[in-house]
Regions:
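Cytoplasmic membrane-interface "Motif A"-like loop-to-helix N-cap segments
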Residues: 73-85, 282-296
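Helix-to-loop junctions at the C-terminal end of transmembrane segments
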Residues: 63-76, 275-286, 373
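Helix-loop-helix hairpin linking two adjacent transmembrane segments in secondary transporters
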Residues: 142-192
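C-terminal transmembrane helical hairpin of 12-TM major facilitator-type secondary transporters
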Residues: 287-334
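Extracytoplasmic gate region of multi-pass secondary transporters
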Residues: 28-29, 221-275, 331, 335
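Conserved MFS/SLC helix-loop-helix module at the cytosolic interface between two early adjacent transmembrane helices
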Residues: 62-99
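Juxtamembrane intracellular "pre-TM" segments in multi-pass secondary transporters
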Residues: 1-2, 193-226
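Cytoplasmic helix-loop-helix junction between adjacent transmembrane helices
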Residues: 107-147
Length: 413
């Protein structure tokens, strides 16, 4: 029964990530809605359009990095997830009430703050409930929520926007977040009685305990190399999901309804590849895991180059699908490597560090892509930034493999 219950928690976290990502991509879909663009005076301004995702990611990154140690030390993942869901639902509902672009940016930044600890809290749950040689699959399954959220998010927001208008779509998403999100957390996400998330209250002062957790996270071995890979991975995610709708509508002539499903297709493929990546992780030794980044990064970069240089729709679709398959296969390796190295009482904060800093850096990718597009006059030209991100994955993965192999040989000697 306990075996089944811990997997219920993983599935609940998967769907929590699904609704969070559906909530995040609504801005990417809004950028092809003339009424939304006119309301916030964003028409034709690619750089300012990219800023809407950038401010969200800045709030998200700072929260993941700085707020997670407080939540891990003082609340545990169940109560922290409950608070997070309530806040992000309220902020989603408040988004259309913003009377100016500046106010919308503030709301988006606060939304990022409320969602920032989500992946760190998920990592804490899996570390509590699964042994070291079992974490590949639950990490992969829960991470499927990213792709599934994008798969469902693009057509869902497109449908809501087409039938209820852009403003009402925010309110309906907020209601979905609140009702479904709270039900998932309260019914299925439970800490173990002996876990680090439910340990007795420490008599030390609060700030001292939080600082101790934060310091342990910073001292995680191989943290720098894993961080570089996280930056590159998130750069690809946010860059591609932010601009794929505009690429399909503005450059390829799809309608908004067609765009919703076409934008989702590449992320459907990454669902299967993420799970396969998790299965592979449980069958190889930890020091071999970085090879997934080397092979996946090289293959993804080549596929994105294929998207940029192809003119036939069939080849463009093939390269988009292949790129996301190769990118998706890398997904579970990052938290699995971190769980291998981080101290159990600081694993959430360690993931918060790399996820937070990764999002802070990748926050500027949508804006950078918008600037490249503005200078070159084509949406696809901005995809060169995605190629650079995957080349960084390749190089950092190779360096991490070398370091881990050397550490293993020294330990055996």
């Amino acid at each position: 029964v306990q075996q089944r219950q811990r997997w219920f928690g993983v599935i609940a976290l998967l769907f929590l990530i699904v609704i969070a990502y559906a909530d995040r991509v609504n801005i990417a879909v809004m950028l092809v809605n003339p009424d939304f663009l006119q309301h916030f005076q964003l028409g034709g301004d690619r750089a300012h359009q990219g800023t809407l995702m950038t401010v969200f990611l800045l709030g998200y990154g700072l929260s993941a990095m700085l707020l997670t140690p407080f939540l891990e030390t003082l609340m545990g993942y169940r109560r922290a997830l409950t608070l997070s869901v309530v806040l992000w639902a309220l902020l989603t509902a408040a988004s259309p009430l913003a009377g100016s672009l500046m106010l919308l940016c503030v709301v988006r930044a606060l939304l990022g703050v409320s969602e920032g600890p989500l992946f760190s809290l998920k990592t804490m749950y899996i570390s509590d409930h699964f042994a070291a040689d079992e974490r590949g699959k639950p990490n992969a399954v829960s991470a499927l929520g990213v792709s599934l959220g994008l798969v469902l998010g693009f057509p869902l927001v497109s449908f809501l926007m087409a039938h209820f208008g852009w403003a009402m779509s925010f309110h309906l998403l907020a209601l979905l977040n609140l009702l479904l999100g709270l039900a998932l957390v309260r019914l299925f996400v439970h800490p173990l009685a002996w876990s680090s998330s439910s340990r007795p209250t420490d008599p030390q002062p609060v700030l001292s305990r939080v600082w101790h957790t934060f310091a342990l996270a910073w001292r995680t071995p191989m943290l720098g190399w894993i961080l570089l890979i996280e930056i590159a991975t998130l750069s690809y995610l946010w860059g591609s999901s932010s601009w794929l709708p505009a690429y399909l509508t503005d450059e390829k002539g799809f309608s908004i309804k067609q765009m919703g499903w076409m934008a989702a297709l590449p992320f459907i493929v990454s669902i299967a590849s993420k799970y396969l990546g998790g299965v592979l992780l449980d069958r190889i030794r930890p020091y071999q895991a970085p090879l997934i980044f080397v092979c996946g990064g090289a293959a993804t970069a080549l596929c994105i180059y294929g998207v940029m240089s192809s003119h036939q729709l069939g080849w463009i679709a093939f390269f988009l699908l292949a790129a996301n398959a190769c990118w998706g296969a890398q997904g579970a390796a990052i938290p699995t490597l971190l769980q291998h190295y981080a101290r159990p009482e600081a694993v959430g904060s360690a993931y918060g560090l790399i996820n937070g800093i990764g999002n802070l850096f990748s926050a500027f990718v949508p804006m950078a892509m918008g600037m490249v597009m503005a200078s070159q006059g084509k949406v696809s030209s901005g995809f060169a930034v995605l190629i650079a991100s995957q080349l960084l994955t390749l190089l950092a993965g190779g360096a991490l493999f070398g370091r881990m192999l050397l550490a293993r040989q020294m330990k055996r000697a």
